[in-house]
Amino acid sequence: MTADYSFLKSFAEYIIDKLEKGTEVQIILPNNFSCLELKKILTDKYKIKLPIIIPFNSLISKKTDSDYVSKIEELLIISKIITEYKDLQFNKNESLKAAEILRKLINDLIINNIDIKLIEVYNNSNYWQKIYKFLEYCFLRWQEEISLTQKQTKAIHKLKLLQEEIIRIKNKQIILVGMFKPNVFLKRFEEDLKDYIVYYNQTSKQISDGISYYEPNDIYEEAVAIAYICSRNKDKRIAIITNNNKLKRVYCNFLDRYEDLLGNDLRLTNIGELLTSIIKILCNNFDLKLLFLLLKNPLINCSATQKLEVMLSNKNRFISSPKYLLQLQFDNEDTKEYCRNLIDILFTDNPHNILDILTLTKEIAEKLLPTIWEKEGGAELVEFLTNLTAYSKYINSMDKKDFPKIFSFLLSNIKYYKNTDSANIIIAPPEDLALCTFDLIILPHFNNENWTPTAKSHPWLSKKALQILNIDYNETASTLYSDYFNLFLQNKQVIILNAKKYDGKLSVPSNLFLKLQDVIPAVHYVIPAEAGIHLDMDSRRCWNDIRKDDIGDESTAHSHSFPSVLSVTDIETLIRNPYGFYAKKILGLRKKDNIWEEPKISDFGNFIHKVLEEYSKNYDKQFINLNLLDKQNALINIGNHILYGTILPNYTKKTWQIKLTAFSKAFILFDIERRKNCKEIYFETKGELRLNIAGQDIKIIGIADRIEISKSNHITILDYKTGTIPTKKEIELGLSPQLIIESLMLLENGFNIKNENTIVNSVGLGYKARGATPIIIGETTSNDVGKPKSIDYTIAYVKITSTEPYVQTTEIALSIETLNKHKAGLIKLLEYYVTNKSFSYDLNLSKYNDYLHLSR
């Protein structure tokens, strides 16, 4: 049968009976939401004068004129004390996190009137004595620092409020309704009023028959399922139960209107991230990434930001000073003016301490966004800034590079509540809603991590030590969550969700659900696959699952033309990734390296090629007579000179210098050895191969890193590789055709190369050696013209690394017959694309694909 039990309605009947007998009572519930619900029930159904109904926290949260040490000031004081303690070396960030735990421990001891010496002798181990000395030192120093403020702590202030309330309500009947999370104040309240407190915690054994269970594949599919359920139940009052703020943010991305009782981390709001970004800029050396982390904040992002980002992509992304920003070639004055204003606002002043940083942060934020404090969370944030500025003396001398993490941590302690009036969906932790009744309860991510959450062990005190101090509050956690769960099951409809995977780990159902399986023989599904959870959310649709019918028969891109000039790398792209070729060569699209990207392997490869090219081309003029060490130094100096004129991060330059130095000697020895058997060597030589394909003239161009002609007229084309070299199989299949095509260029006289015995004539340039008759490569001119010889070809990949072995050579011999087969295959490939001009989306054999997102 459908459950119709309501905890608060049941209590309302109970209390009406008490009130009718003239009993004066004070009703205390765990939270404000439950109080509002109870008042509504009593007002709507019984039309009576309401008794005093308050949440427990209101007893210790009244506003008074008393001045007390704020939480943020107390954390900074304790953090300073922890950092001072040299036997346990904490950095600033660690000490602040430890301060949160130590603050709670100190307050528990003070409120319970417990002497810390109680635990000094419970364990005589050296480890424990070391911990005890640390805790005692911090406790005594804390007392000294608090006395200097001439204020009481917030905990003592709350205790005084509680004591005043205890005196005021003594001799009245007090009813504690529902389940309360144990804490030091509740414990004190119960002890002092044990003769006056009545506990009401009656529950029903009845369980709804409207319970359903569903396992989405991941947390995003779970969020889609929640949104789908809510969209199908708009006329119902829905509660989504979670105490995980990270998961809540995922769920809320798919919901329009909801009331949020969990609250938002102020650090993660747009306004919080704006201030954090400003502080990162002020506390660090100039960094474009940090600059655009600020500029792309939704509150200040604009078209000028996007234009500036495009200008700073590719090589400009490594500029190391704001002054270089104004040296850019601006397309229009508006962007230039925008850039100039940014520099004036962000980089004019250089604050030296934390107080200056906080003051300047506020000024910069107001210049960038004059209405900043009117935004969501603005009031809370300006109050936080004011307090932190007031107490900055505790951290004023710290290294400013540590401050962004400190600021972010402190900000994460501030909650901001954004609620939507008249929303039928409420998101809250279980303790806030367990006593209330809803049409539909959704229990997402129902596993042991969230139901019941594992209690975190204390970093310094063992469980036994906590029990000796009588401040161990974790014992009742599992019982509490079991009670919450039982109450939720008494609602009309309950849907339990548990994503199969989260953060890459398999999810294990909660033990509470395993108990439920014994109660309900067959859990049915109210979210069948045909309901279309995935299909209703187009933005989450998985393209891999779309059938051809969904997009028609078109799986290719079409063009009206085919390029007449191709590079050897274009040919490889055409083979491995036809759509990438289409996007690059026909649409003219080029991927820009955005400012977030670090220097790539290909950037390092280009640098090494430049170094080796300059060294090799100047070898005969400058380096041939040098000894090994001087040649090595010359190679390194070439690299340093190139890096000096290149815009790169300093750490990248140092890394590349180290790598160049590592393999420099090995390369010099490799070069000397190869030169011994060569009569001619050509470096970075341009070549071309001309073909007529289906009536269209095609020119393929390429640059050979190194071409060697041996004393026996053996020709080797070498390619320097700092990355992965292709396999022999890839070369044989034509998937890595660069050196094959360069060999065809040689075969077809595509390079402008000559020597006394062998002439390789570039047809395009029309070069002819004086006194020599050009011949087709594949034959040799010798003193005995009547005896032509076939020339051998070899292609070689030279792998260069910064670890041993520094230089490795992989050689593959090629015959004229093999080259002719490859040429026939190349012609066939080009004939297909020149004739059809269609490029498949689906074929993608590339290791790196800049156009994959476009093909979708």
Curated annotation (Swiss-Prot):
Domain of life per record: Bacteria
The organism of origin for this protein: Rickettsia felis (strain ATCC VR-1525 / URRWXCal2)
UniProt-recorded name of the protein: Uncharacterized protein RF_0624
Entry-linked InterPro entries: P-loop_NTPase (IPR027417), PDDEXK-like_dom_sf (IPR011604), PDDEXK_AddAB-type (IPR038726), Restrct_endonuc-II-like (IPR011335), RPE2 (IPR022436)
Disulfide cysteine pairs (residue numbers): none
Listed Pfam families: PDDEXK_1
